[in-house]
């Protein structure tokens, strides 16, 4: 893959100079959805899918960015003196946002760059193509400009900051953290309030993790994602009038139920309930996994989906069909929506001897009920 992209880079930008290659993975979140901006826990793992960059410094301050995924857009040019978001900049707003954040934090970019990007994460799939691109840009800049003091955790934080403040999506830290800190065959149990984390092996002896792409795209910026965050922040302020808490993640289920009437809106109550209960589900799920209790892990995944569908209201008809189909198949241990919502992917844990039947049945029945194919084959098994 890298050799082909380097060759494409040379044809596009010329063969001379110090040409370097980089990669940052996407992620799938096993459980802990919409908890990362509510002070809760998450449990993502990095994927082999991700984003590649081939890059070279320039002698001037020009930026020439090209995506092999959007060939018709050609090379998009700007400069280090023009790091402002714009509709015309399209996908380049993500790397430009990271560059802007580097400069803002005192990491001076002294040269322009030629960059070729290629990603094999489907856009809008909920597998964090934008976070992967942000972390990729951070890793590239750290190496190209020898910012050796920067840690991978700081690169994740830079990615989140740029998406919040340059791209206008009020996301939490999970996606960038999973991309920056991902480790083969492990998920990351992350406390988003403290950034304390531990790796947990997810090599399952008798089951596989299967990702199904609904092929329904979403844009977190244009969707109700920011609304959900605002609703949770308002609910937190209402609860803080009666409780000494810093985040919704500080609460147990019992504490929430005893004090939920402080939240003045039924909708905000539902949003806060999801944040509290999902955080506790995530803690219990990791405990179950450590105890090799995959059945309990699956039940918690199922409960997570119900909460995301009914309380947080970030699912959609196509995703619910995929999950309902999964639940109906013998050998499926658990299934839920993954990612920000409003489309994207489901993640399921499926017993080894049921994987082929799962792929065949879900694929055929989804197409019959929805009218288009889901992205689902042996490559969906991670």
Residue spans of the language-model regions?
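C-terminal nucleotide
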Residues: 1-27, 52-88, 186-334, 349-382
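Gly/Ser-rich oxyanion-binding loop with an adjacent helix/lid
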Residues: 1-22, 28-32, 38-41, 80, ...
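N-terminal cofactor/phosphate-binding cores enriched in small/glycine residues
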Residues: 32-34, 46-47
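Short Gly/aromatic-enriched secondary-structure transition segments
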Residues: 39-46, 228-229
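A short, compositionally biased micro-patch
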Residues: 46-48, 58, 120, 183
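Glycine-rich phosphate-binding loop
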Residues: 342
